[in-house]
UniProtKB/Swiss-Prot annotation:
Gene Ontology CC annotations of this record: cytoplasm
Catalytic activity: a carboxylic ester + H2O = an alcohol + a carboxylate + H(+)
Keywords per UniProt: Cytoplasm, Hydrolase, Serine esterase
Protein name, as recorded: Esterase 52 kDa subunit
Top-level taxon: Eukaryota
Location relative to the cell: Cytoplasm
Family, similarity comment: Belongs to the type-B carboxylesterase/lipase family.
Keyword Coiled coil in annotation: no
Chief subcellular location: cytoplasm
EC annotation from Swiss-Prot or TrEMBL: 3.1.1.1
UniProt KW Hydrolase keyword: yes
GO terms for MF: carboxylesterase activity
Length: 10
């Protein structure tokens, strides 16, 4: 999954 703004990746 892409790393979103915030720095988490589910």
């Amino acid at each position: 999954a892409p790393i979103v703004s915030g720095g988490y990746d589910f």
